[in-house]
Amino acid sequence: MKRKMPQKTGIVMIAAGAVLILAALLLLLYNNAVSERAGRESDAVMDGLRAAIAQREQRKTRETAPDVIAAPDTAAPEADVTSDTTAAVTTDAETEPAAPRTEMTVVAVNGHDYIGYIEIPAISLSLPVMAEWSDERLKITPCRHFGATWTDDLVIAGHNYRRHFASLKKLVPGDGVSFTDMDGNVIEYAVTKSETMLPTAVDAVQNSGHDLVLYTCTYSGDTRTVVFCDRTEPT
């Protein structure tokens, strides 16, 4: 009986190893399925976002276009502006500069609120960005975690799905990034640097001093890949 113990132990270890390999394979298949589903949902949202932005731009054009009215046959005599000695009155409200805008336009698409979409040509990425962050929302698209484009402190979080932010680690300084908001404004950025940071480094991400920050989990889940970007000067 004693001689059979090592053989039985070996069989148990082989069986346990096979179970672990099978579990890892099933986990890989599950993660791939989740990633593909997230990619399909993001693609569907992108179509809706582009359509919504186009509609808003058309509406804006119609609202700002001047009304053309045919002049009557007997037009009123033109006013002699040179003889008008009444001084124009300018109120304090008219002279004060408008307060800087801080809030981004939010539009609902497929039941969720979005602030626009991000494009990163270097890794062939085009993804919608939800207005608010949550674990459930991240399963669909990347989400705004902090800030806004207007205040140059936008932070976008995304899962490390293959169709989402898994390729952030491939970006290098100088790679271009663009963000299109729901008003049709396109903001151009360039990657400044990339770092691997702990999940607790919230302040370093939120108050980085950079105009745009993108981040995702590493495969271990213990750290974060963080990409810092800054606006590029218009050419």
Each language-model region and where it sits:
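Solvent-exposed, non-transmembrane regions of membrane-associated and secreted proteins
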Residues: K8-T235
